[in-house]
Curated annotation (Swiss-Prot):
Sites where the protein binds Mg(2+): D482, D488
Keywords for this protein: Cytoplasm, Magnesium, Metal-binding, Nucleotidyltransferase, RNA-binding, Transferase
EC number: 2.7.7.8
Organism of provenance: Wolbachia pipientis wMel
Primary location class: cytoplasm
Co-factor(s): Mg(2+)
Catalytic activity line of the entry: RNA(n+1) + phosphate = RNA(n) + a ribonucleoside 5'-diphosphate
Bias (Basic and acidic residues): 702-714
Basic residues bias: start-end ranges: 725-734
Pfam families for this protein: KH_1 (PF00013), PNPase (PF03726), RNase_PH (PF01138), RNase_PH_C (PF03725), S1 (PF00575)
Localization of this protein: Cytoplasm
Gene expressing this chain: pnp
Stated family: Belongs to the polyribonucleotide nucleotidyltransferase family.
The S1 motif domain, residue ranges: 618-686
Lineage of producing organism: Bacteria, Pseudomonadati, Pseudomonadota, Alphaproteobacteria, Rickettsiales
UniProt-recorded name of the protein: Polyribonucleotide nucleotidyltransferase
Length: 757
């Protein structure tokens, strides 16, 4: 029933196999790729183009369902919903690798679906998914005449490169590099780097490319065995129209010389509309005219740049647009920056939060928490267009993740800066390199916020104009240069090294020479941008803004964690409610306190310490009146514990009633005199100097007792002495806290203990 064809090799210490003929046989191309114990099913389906389509409707989807990891989806709905960010990013990597390899003018609809069948949580699925996509295209009959492969590269602590590192190896790696290419050239690069030099990054690319060759050979042998050759595709012939367009060359050249984007766009649209109306009258097809005009413009601009060494806006090939930098422009945010480069502008805003604000990510490796989030928004008005607001698309997710990768290596360790950080980049204008403007703006906004980043980060987008062996590398490309050029190579980093890379091609690949020179030229541009940024702000603020949440942390004994939390969270909830703060307790005993002010944070800290500390006779505590009876006052500690005080201990003088001195909700300092059998503290107000908060050393008023034999005698049935040798009575023994009230550190004015509800 099945005609199975399978090819395999040993690659990177693991078996890599391609198999077809058993699964998904109705697709035009179907391949199961196994790498280690990770398996991906890739299918390709082709649909003949619609008449109105004048672009390549390529749709790439990577799908990772939870069964592949042996899990059931969490939450109320037990079925997968919209694609995760990880799925979207893998889909983009595959799309960017294969899209440039389809012939120009081929507009059939192509669907590439990569289903993760099983995942061993060791071998990431990106590599087998791309390999499977290329293999499935190669056997589908689609006019796809190039054979490429993908590879991941890591770098260990000894600067040794790792081929296809495991998930665990990648966690300790200073490099996370994914690249694709054929035997002779590089096609796509995506990377996060921990400030490695351009030389190290270039060598990593060469290392990865060298290990692509066995896989490319495997795919070719696999396709040859099946024998379904790609069909030929004749390019569109619009030579007769192109000849008629020559007379519009000067008009296009003048329009493209406009440095203001809006003026340039208006001038170009006027010329195109004139050409379309003129040639339609001669009977020419509208789609053919549009196709010919596009190619004519592309050839014209590329020739001007290559031969005259002058770019669209008059800059030299390595010149950066004018840069304007502002910080702290939004008064009530935790940090903000406005970064403008030419006609590209990013408003970047930061917000600080607690661990409770972290993003819980349901990833294929399992749930994890992200304390740094970067969200990129690209509204339609940024390019002068109208469009309804919608959820972030693939492009916005991809650009945001690239900026995240650029900034992530310079963020402080969470133990140093425990805030959760959210960054939002609003692109207000765009004429190329908006993702790199986001990188620059994020670095500025974080420093304005007071985040102790290791170094400022800047980003730049490099372009390429290539004609056979001649080429020109462009720094800080415009949107039109991206559209008409051959490469979009984004490089971000500090003055010391690279932190992120992303390279996309519109041709079938570039040489190592171009890659190396692009990295060198990008470094010069990056240093120039950093100089402009550092002139405004070069170091992080000493502290977070006044209206930002205040944070402090301290440690408690691990055996006190349960007491600090309390039964069903009663203690920590009580402290949070009373102090107006947020408190988080880690498994290691670390307590993080977040409050709107430093004073509130200190109060919460003191209350938490008090709630787990032994309360002893002689302690001076803060209390509040909660109920007044005839001769007894019921008091409450700041952490919620209750105590009692007799009328004779209210004032150092005779009083007829408690209400003459105290009323409901009054607060004061009291001395712990003794404990009832049940552990309830007996308190005294008159034995504390209310101005200094210290033990009252003066003479105490002593009148003849007028209470009955079962009143005061039963309540204060023991004498109290501050002197050594005095009769100090404690409540029933409890587990020791590690502190004594006399010797423990002074955490605040609240030296009480609680934890008993």
């Amino acid at each position: 029933m099945f005609k199975i064809i399978k090819k395999s090799i040993e690659w990177g210490g693991r078996a890599l196999s391609l198999e077809t003929g058993k699964i998904a046989r109705q697709a035009h191309g179907s391949v199961v790729v196994n790498y280690g114990d990770t398996s991906v099913l890739v299918t390709v389906v082709r649909k003949k183009k619609e008449e109105s389509v004048d672009f390549l409707p390529l749709n790439v989807q990577f799908i990772a369902k939870s069964y592949a990891m042996g899990k059931i989806p969490g939450g109320f709905f037990k079925r997968e919903g919209k694609p995760s960010d990880r799925e979207t990013l893998i889909s983009r990597v595959i799309d960017r690798s294969i899209r440039p390899l389809f012939p120009e003018g081929f507009h059939d609809e192509i669907s590439v679906v990569c289903n993760l069948l099983t995942y061993d949580t060791v071998n990431p699925p990106e590599v087998p998914a791309l390999i499977g996509a290329v293999a499935a295209l190669a056997i589908s009959g689609v006019p796809f005449h190039f054979t490429i492969a993908g590879v991941m590269v890591g770098c260990d602590e000894n600067n040794n490169y790792i081929l296809n590192p495991s998930v665990q190896e990648m966690k300790a790696s200073s490099l996370d590099l994914f690249l694709s290419g054929d035997e002779n050239s590089i096609l796509m690069v995506e990377s996060e780097v921990k400030e490695l030099s351009e030389e190290n990054v270039f060598n990593a690319i060469k290392f990865g490319h060298e290990h692509l060759k066995p896989v490319i050979k495997l795919i070719k042998e696999f396709a040859d065995t099946i024998g379904n050759k790609p069909e030929s595709f004749a390019p569109i012939d619009a030579s007769d129209i192109t000849q008629e367009l020559e007379k519009y060359g000067k008009d296009f050249e003048k329009a493209y010389s406009q440095t203001v984007k809006q003026e340039r766009v208006q001038a170009l649209e006027a010329i195109r509309e004139n050409i379309l109306n003129t040639l339609k009258e001669t009977g020419k097809d509208e789609k053919l005219i549009t196709y010919a005009v596009k190619n004519f413009e592309r050839s014209l601009v590329r020739e001007i740049i290559r031969k005259k060494s002058v770019r669209i806006d008059g800059r030299k090939h390595d010149e950066i647009r004018q840069i304007e930098v502002e910080v702290d422009i939004l008064s009530k945010t935790h940090g903000s920056a406005l970064f403008t480069r030419g006609n590209t502008q990013a408003l970047v805003v930061t917000a600080l939060g607690t661990t409770q604000d972290e993003q819980i990510v349901d990833d294929i490796e399992g749930d994890r928490r992200e304390h740094f989030m970067l969200h990129y928004n690209f509204p339609s008005f940024a390019v002068g267009e109208t469009s309804a607001a919608r959820a972030p698309g693939r492009r916005e997710i991809g650009h945001g993740k690239l900026a995240w990768k650029a900034i992530h290596p310079v963020l402080p360790d969470k133990s140093e800066f425990p805030y959760t950080i959210r960054v939002v980049s609003e692109i207000l204008e765009s004429d190329g390199s908006s993702s790199m403007a986001t990188v620059c703006g994020t670095s500025l906004a974080l420093m304005d916020t007071g985040v102790p980043i290791k170094a400022p980060v800047a980003g730049i987008a490099m372009g390429l104009i290539k004609d056979k062996d001649e080429y020109v590398i462009l720094s800080d490309i415009l949107g039109d240069e991206d559209y008409l050029g051959d490469m979009d190579f984004k490089v971000a980093g500090t003055s010391e090294g690279v932190t992120a890379l992303q390279m996309d091609m519109k041709i079938s690949g570039i040489s190592f020479e171009i890659v190396e020179k692009s990295l060198e030229q990008a470094k010069a541009g990056r240093l120039h941008i950093l100089e402009k940024m550092n002139a405004v702000i070069s170091e992080h603020s000493d502290d977070v803004k006044d209206h930002a949440p205040r944070m402090l942390s301290f440690y408690i004994d691990k055996d006190k964690i349960s007491a600090a939390i309390g039964s069903k969270g009663k203690n920590i909830r009580s402290v949070c409610e009373r102090s107006n703060a947020k408190i988080e307790i880690g498994d290691d005993g670390k307590v993080s306190v977040f409050a709107t002010s430093g004073t509130e944070a200190e109060i919460a800290k003191s209350m938490m310490i008090d709630s787990i500390t032994e309360l002893e006779q002689g302690s001076i505590v803060d209390v509040k009146v909660v109920r007044i009876e005839k001769s007894i006052v019921e008091l409450e500690f700041l952490n919620g514990r209750k105590g009692k005080m007799h009328i004779s201990e209210v004032a150092n003088e005779h009083i007829d009633s408690i209400e003459s001195v105290l009323k409901q909700d009054d607060t004061f300092k009291a001395l712990v005199i003794d404990f009832e059998k049940g552990g309830c503290p007996k308190l005294s107000r008159r034995r504390v100097d209310q101005e200094t908060g210290e033990f009252f050393e003066g003479e105490l008023y002593n009148e003849e007792r007028k209470d009955g034999p079962n009143d005061r005698d039963n309540y204060y049935n023991n004498s109290f002495s501050r002197k050594p040798g005095g009769s100090h009575h404690k409540r029933p023994p409890r587990p020791h806290s590690g502190f004594s009230n006399r010797n423990r550190p002074k955490f605040g004015n609240n030296d009480s203990s609680s934890g008993f509800y």
